[in-house]
Amino acid sequence: FQAEDGIRDRSPSRGLGDVYKRQIAYFLKGIVSFQNRNTIYDFNEKPNQGIRGARNWIKSHLDKWSDQPGADLFSCEFEFDYLMCNRTRHSQLLSIIPGHGPLRKELVILEAHLDSRCESLCDTICLAEGADDNGSGSALLMEISRNLCLFSLSRTIVILWVTGEEQGLGGSRSFATFCKQNAIPIKAVFNNDIVGGIECGKTSSPPSCPGPYQYDSTRLRLFSSGVTNSMSKNLARLSKLIIDDASKDSSFHLPQIDVMFGEDRSGRGSDHIPFRELGYSAVRFTSSYEHGDGNPNQPDYTDRQHSSRDILGQDINGDGILDSFYVDFNYLRNNTLVNAISAVNAASSTFDPYKLQLIPDVNSLVVKIENPQNALEYIIGIRKINSAYFDTIIFSKFPEITINDLNASTYYVTAAGRDSNGWIGMFGQEYNARILSNTNNLSFASPVELLQNRPNPFDELTLIPIIINDPQFVKNAQLEIYTESGHPIKFIKLDLKTGLNEILYDYQWNNYN
């Protein structure tokens, strides 16, 4: 592969190797060549066909890389029982890059589902290349394995080619359950599902794209659960911070990371969710634009997602060689680097989450880190209640700072530390402080506060915050939502607790009769 096709991260604190567009293209072409990778197209007597053939082909590359001088990588298969398409026994492939030192038993997981599907969920005969969904994520994992096998990291990296995503997340749920039952600590989970396409379809699951023949190769969506005091959301915020930071110091073009409010697109899901359900920090990367909403049974569905049309590309001039691709290899290469940087940071940072003391005053706030751990730099993230990402980020050499000229509001504050190698620890608990504009504001707060929803306007989810200052005033609570004309949309029974309560409103509730 020619050197000009590679990208080298020149940031000395990262030390990441080359990520090659041509290498990724080769991997993706190999994966789609198996034509149908349905979860149940997996037979001992057909080792070179279906999803078993794809697993064996990937493993042959892992074995080759593990034989390199200085490489530290081994692969294995995880067998599990989970009923999918009338079959119970399944298998999925892992590559493992062992950690070194006292944190080596903690895992950082990179995952992507290898299985594909066409219009029929359990069809093993149809053409189901699954080029973007999810050959793109599977090829991304191969390139990361090739690069990181020469790294020596504090935590162990597990790279998981999941099976059964299309049939209900069976593979990821089984592996997450295995980790939980065996008390295996997991620092972070990075899921990649549909990460190579840049074209919007006629349909797409919101929040997504404006319509057909629209393209975006500059942004990457990052989904995670929760908003306030969510470790998954904090992992998403940290990933954006790291990528924004790397973009300033690098000659290559990383995508802009959009931290989304929801855990996934409306009505959709993927393999990060079972890990989050069991208490692990887990996020999902997915393309800014998608070609389809994954529902091929609807009338006049012509998009590629979940259909036999999810192919690598077209031969326009009839010479037998694809020359128009539905997966953008530059975009997929950049998304591969996003994952490599995020995963290596998670596997390298050693700081414990910070505990904070907040001292509010009139138009000001003192933030004190109680366990600073001698960081080279302290990073304080501040946001208002309605923001998914930080509104303000402060970089300081000192573990105690005073922030002046604040508007009267409630602020949520968290912090992380950067070590001498540039790695950043996980953001810890969010602490809140109410800032007053003058001493006349010291009157008692209302027992219940219903705050403005954000984002507003919205096209998918919006967050409705409710603050309970005095729980004795609340017995039975219900949130009632109406149209401007008074038509009822949704009544939601609320179980409110003292402090902040967050309700995510789904745009689909507007589809009343």
Positions of predicted regions on the chain:
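Metal-dependent peptidase/peptidase-like ectodomains
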Residues: V162-L278, A282
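Extracellular fibronectin type III
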Residues: S420-N438
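A non-catalytic alpha/beta surface segment that caps or lines the substrate-entry region
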Residues: Y26-P98
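Short, small-residue-biased leader/transition segments that mark boundaries at the very start
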Residues: A3-Y20, G417
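Active-site-adjacent mobile loop/cap segments within catalytic or ligand-binding domains
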Residues: V32, V195-Q214, M260-T350
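Glycine-centered coil/turn sites that cap beta-strands in beta-rich domains
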Residues: V366-K368, N440-T483, F491-L494, L500-N510
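Alpha-helical metal-binding/catalytic segments enriched in His/Glu/Asp
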Residues: L110, D115-S116, L121-L169, N339
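Beta-strand-rich modules
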Residues: I403-I424
